Structure formats: C-alpha cells, structure tokens
Design a protein with these regions (language model features):
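Aromatic-lined carbohydrate-binding/catalytic grooves of carbohydrate-active enzymes
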Residues: 1-93, 106
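Active-site beta-loop-alpha junctions enriched in small/polar residues
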Residues: 1-2, 45-49, 112-114, 153-157
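Hydrophobic faces of well-ordered beta-strands that scaffold small-molecule active sites
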Residues: 40-44, 107-109, 151-152, 231
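Glycan-recognition surfaces
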Residues: 50-89, 93, 131-232
Length: 233
C-alpha cells in the first residue's frame, strides 16, 4: 500500500500511500471495509528500510552499521537505528500521522530481519537503546490512541516477550498456519503467555504434503480456537 512497494526490494520506509495502487487514497478501501461491518487494519514495518527507498537515500546514516564495514542486508533491507533520537522521532511521527489521518483500528507491527551490525565492543548498548526507544514509541501510541490494537510480529514469533506483552494487544506467534503444527506451537506459547494474545489464523493453505493431506476446515477452526481466531489468505 506504500511507496514504490512492488516487491520486497524497494519502498520500505516510505510510508505514504502508493497513488497507482490507491488512486483515491486509502479512504475508499477503509469505507468499503466499514461497509462490510469490519474495522480497518494496516501492516507496517517501522524498524526497517530498503536501500532502494527515499528514506534511505535521504538518511543513509540512520541505520545500524559498523564503521568501515558494508552494512548487511537481510530480506533486501537494513535495520533503522531507533537508538538515534531523530530516528525515534521519525517513526513516532510517521505512525501518529497514519493514525490521525485514517480510521485505523489495528496495526500489524512486523520486523522481518535480525539485528545485525551491532556488537558490544563497537556499538555498546546499541540493542538496549533500540529496544527502549521501541518501548517509548509503543507507550506513546497506547496513550494517544487507546482504541488502536497493535499486533507484534517478527518473522513469526520472534517478538514474543514480556516487554512486548505489556505494550501490544496480540502476538503473531508463527507463520506456520498448519493446524496440526499449530497445536504444538500454541501449547508451547500458552505455557508462558495468555491465549487471548495469540493470533490463530485459519488459512486455505495445504498441510505439509510430506506427511498429511489438506486439513478439514472444522479441524482448522477448532485448532484456531486455542487463541484469538482469524481468517487469512
């Protein structure tokens, strides 16, 4: 929905509506969603940026990197350094802008790469500064937009921890939506965390063909009832 995002190689970090995809803006889509009796949600990945983006071209110094070394890409993207006050301000202002402009009830906050280009000897406390800034942003959003639910996601369940549980409404615990596998994933999750915070989607994806055929829909829904169920593609 944003920037020049036609693949995972470009546009990440440019959080403005793509006019080719939405010539009438997001409002038309939001109105259609509301007409169907649903609230509107949006996917964002505020911590990452593509090298091929207006944001990175304007601020190449905003990413985590080690002096004298070429920064690493994962999934064709760098990681913004939230430990820099100007980056923290940018992310918070961007999210405030979206939530003040559009009738958004839900944000899926994704994070699709590991934190590389940091080490204690060369960038002391870089991880801590990043996470504390993330917490400040989430705390501010919760205070200013109490009716907006944020789901924490990170390549699956890499963001499941107590710090995020305090600040988000739900966790995306795994990209694996196979109902048989989910029974084990969900059991492990609920040993520590509340089932109501666990997103459990029913999808039309076949089960692992090496072991099982396509699962019965009733089975899929029964498995999803172990947490907060949803329906996805």
């Amino acid at each position: 929905w944003f920037g020049a995002r036609y693949s995972d190689r470009a546009g990440l970090g440019d959080w403005t509506v793509n006019p080719e995809k939405f010539p009438n803006g997001l409002e038309e889509l939001i109105d259609r969603v509301h007409a169907l009796g649903m609230d509107f949600g949006l996917w964002v990945e505020p911590e990452s940026v593509n090298p091929d983006s207006d944001l990175y071209r304007a601020h190449p110094d905003w990413i985590h990197k080690l002096d004298g070394r070429e920064p690493l890409t994962q999934r064709n993207q760098y990681l913004l350094d939230f430990g820099k006050p100007e980056v923290e301000r940018f992310a918070l202002d961007m999210l405030r802008g979206l939530l003040n402009t559009y009738a958004i009830r839900y944000l899926k906050w994704d994070m699709n790469r590991a934190m590389t280009d940091v080490c204690e000897s060369l960038t002391p406390f870089a991880r801590e500064r990043h996470v504390l800034a993330l917490y400040r942003i989430l705390d501010a959003l919760e205070k200013e937009f109490p009716d907006v639910d944020i789901e924490a996601c990170s390549g699956g369940g890499a963001r499941v921890d107590l710090g995020m549980a305090k600040r988000t409404a739900q966790f995306w615990v795994s990209d694996n939506t196979d109902p048989f596998d989910r029974l084990f994933i969900q059991e492990g999750y609920t040993l520590m965390y509340a089932p109501m915070m666990m997103s459990c989607w029913v999808t039309d994806t076949p089960a692992d063909g090496r072991r099982r055929g396509r699962a019965d829909w009733r089975y899929k829904f029964h498995a999803a009832m172990g947490g907060t169920p949803g329906v996805g593609a």
